[in-house]
From Swiss-Prot:
Gene symbol of the encoding locus: czcD
Keyword line: Cadmium, Cell membrane, Cobalt, Cobalt transport, Ion transport, Membrane, Potassium, Potassium transport, Transmembrane, Transmembrane helix, Transport, Zinc, Zinc transport
Keyword Zinc: yes
InterPro entries: Cation_efflux (IPR002524), Cation_efflux_CTD (IPR027470), Cation_efflux_CTD_sf (IPR036837), Cation_efflux_TMD_sf (IPR027469), CDF/SLC30A (IPR050681)
Family: Belongs to the cation diffusion facilitator (CDF) transporter (TC 2.A.4) family. SLC30A subfamily.
The keyword Zinc is annotated on this UniProt entry: yes
Annotated organism of origin: Bacillus velezensis (strain DSM 23117 / BGSC 10A6 / LMG 26770 / FZB42)
Topological domains, Extracellular: 1-14, 67-80, 139-159
Main location per the UniProt record: membrane
Described purpose of this protein according to its UniProt entry: Involved in divalent cation and potassium homeostasis in the cell. Catalyzes the active efflux of zinc, cadmium and cobalt, in exchange for potassium and H(+) ions.
Annotated protein name in UniProt: Cadmium, cobalt and zinc/H(+)-K(+) antiporter
GO biological process terms held by the UniProt record: cobalt ion transport; potassium ion transport
Length: 313
């Protein structure tokens, strides 16, 4: 159903793998450098990169699992794992950023001695690595529509800012002896991390809550279906995302009771084509006549009724 879903998946996977290898390798160097130079800005950036490499690894596993076929046990396959991974990733970012802020506050009152030359060298290398990875992601991956790639890309961008922060802090300490610059840089990094973590978590939870996809205009969709020749009205409408870039719709449509099966088929084909252009790739429409017992509201209102009275889904 999902148009060119698998093709995008292949290039996204390659981008994630290259990024994962580069970021993990550099993260180890930066963590060792942070301990040796005693720089919280470097350590916070390494912590951020650790969450990066974990998120990239989880994203890779998510892509691998998403390729598994649907089964009787899981009729959607493992496509949702990607969204679950994005939630874990977002929460990890939030926790890491809060810990960095806590550490930085302690350091403001007792700034330790920082080996600035080492700090400067490592953060410049870090910036170069981040720029390269961000470039690979932008050119090879789907940073706009795929939540997992977007999450990983946001990590890399805020990492880049983290490296810039560490470079500035090192320069300030070298030239002005401002030892508070190190914890200050880490707080700025932490706030950026917190922000991207919040957004990734919020968007992922919206998908898990079966929320309407952000790029779908519900009023326009209702209008499109109801304006189709042969459709009298619709009700019990649901629009949701199965995973990034795979939107689904189900509804009941009231049609003339004289309609033949082949006529209703051609109405369905027309609606599927129209909705496909509007970003909905998985469409299920139940055709029924006005005589069929139903609730007239467009959106499903069945929260409080007895399951036995429930209109058929």
């Amino acid at each position: 159903m999902g148009h060119n879903h698998n093709h995008a998946g292949g290039s996204n996977k390659k981008v994630l793998l290259i990024s994962f290898i580069m970021i993990t390798g550099y993260m180890i160097i930066e963590a060792i450098g942070g301990f040796l130079t005693n720089s919280l800005a470097l350590l916070s950036d390494a912590g951020h990169m650790l969450s990066d490499s974990i998120s990239l690894m989880v994203a890779l596993i998510a892509f691998k699992l998403a390729e598994k076929k649907a089964s009787h046990h899981k009729t959607f396959g493992y496509k949702r794992f990607e969204i679950l991974a994005a939630v874990i990733n977002g929460v990890a970012l939030i926790l890491i950023s809060l810990y960095i802020i806590y550490e930085a506050i302690k350091r403001f009152s007792h700034p330790p001695e920082v080996a600035t030359t080492g700090m400067l060298t490592i953060s410049i290398i870090g910036l170069a690595v981040n720029i390269l990875v961000a470039w690979i992601m932008l050119n090879g991956g789907d940073t706009k529509n795929n939540l997992n790639i977007r999450g990983a890309y946001l990590h890399v961008i805020s990492d880049m800012l983290g490296s810039i922060g560490a470079i500035l802090a090192a320069i300030l300490i070298i030239f002005f002896g401002w030892s508070w610059a190190d914890p200050a840089a880490s707080v700025i990094v932490a706030i950026l991390v917190l922000r991207s973590g919040y957004h990734v978590t919020k968007d992922s939870i919206h998908v898990l809550m079966e929320g309407t996809p952000g790029n779908i205009d519900v009023t326009d969709i209702i209008h499109t279906i109801e304006e189709t020749e042969g459709i009298q009205s619709i009700h019990d409408l649901h629009i949701w995302s199965i995973t990034s870039g795979l939107n689904a719709l189900s509804c009941h449509a009231v049609v003339n009771d004289q309609l033949t099966i082949s006529e209703s088929e051609s109405i369905l084909r027309k609606i599927e084509h129209e909705l496909g252009d509007k970003g909905i790739t998985h469409v299920t429409i139940q055709m029924e006549t006005a005589a069929h017992n139903h609730d007239n509201t467009i959106l499903c209102q069945s929260q409080t009724e007895n399951p036995r009275d429930h209109h058929h889904h």
